[in-house]
Structures are given as C-alpha cells and as structure tokens.
Amino acid sequence: MRRKLSTPTAKTSRRLRTGAKKDYPLDQIRRHLETGPIVLVSSAWKGKTNIMTMGWHMMMEFTPALFGCYIWSGNHSFKMIRKAKECVINIPTIDLVNEVVGIGNSSGEKLDKFQKFGLTPVAAEKVEAPLIAECYANFECQLAEARMISRYGLFIWEVVKAHVATSPKNPQTLHYRGQGEFRVAGRTINLRKKFKPQNL
C-alpha cells in the first residue's frame, strides 16, 4: 500500500526548526555537501519507503551536479535504491541527532522508519522517494552511473532538484568522527578574498 505523503506546512513537525524551504541552484549544492555532513537517504520502491544514515559520500561534478555515495550491499536500502534508481539525500541538523543514530541502528526491512522516528515524508517533485520535512536540505537524485555498484557499492547520482531552508544561515550539521562521536558544525569563516577565482 502506498504511503500517504504530506505537503510541507508551517505545522509539519514539532522538530522543524528551519525556515521555509526554497528551490536552490543545482550548481551550488556543493556548499552543503562538500563539507561532508551526515545525511539521511530516503528511498521508495513498490509502495514502501525507507531511510538510512550515511556518512560516506562526495561531490563529483558541479554542472551537472553529480554526487557519489557508498552503500553496503547488505543494507536493505541498497536493494530498494538499486531497483528504484533514485533517492533523496536529506541533511539533518543537531536537532535530529538521536534520530540519525536510531535510523543507523535499525533495518527498514520490517520497520517503517518514518513512523518509528516521527519523521514526516513529503512528496518530491521529480522522484518517487520522499523528502524528510524535518531536514535542513533535501536533494532529489536520479542514478547517473551504475557501473561501479556491483563491485564497489558506489552509486553516482545526478541531483535533479534541490530544496534548502532559508534559515538558519549556519545550520548545525553533524559530522561523524567514529567511535560514536559527532562533530557539530555551524560557524562559517569566509576567506573568499584569499582564493584564486578558479579555486572557488
């Protein structure tokens, strides 16, 4: 049975502490992903949805916006995402740290993680996988390259739609350090004047 998806509203969730989201330029998504935050990957296949926690990912190209990530073949999300050939990369902030850990500790094979962790699925514009309303940013992805999936578990995605909250300006994203420790971001240091233009 297909899960009913919500439409984003001001009352979407008690944990939604970001500003309203707006469309975001695809060639600028690197500003949110190149810093290496923990992400939540949402997927959908044959009426079922799932979420997984991920820390291994990288920007690969800016235009078009290509994004690579590793998914272990034994993960339930691996099977769903490989079949669907699409997903949503969602960026949580410190408000969702317990959900990030809980999602990473559980399998979606027999569990509805949206329901279990009180997260709100919102219909995406270009993919079937839902956005996670409580996350600061959501990037809709379609599979761009599949040749390295079987051997390395490496998926290469094209981001086809991006949604980023208008506030806070400096979100407190999570960065995993191993051994159960996270570093929390939030402060931005602007050294643009010191960069060569081609290196920006």
Stretches with model-predicted labels:
Residues R2-L200:
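Basic, polyanion-binding surface patches
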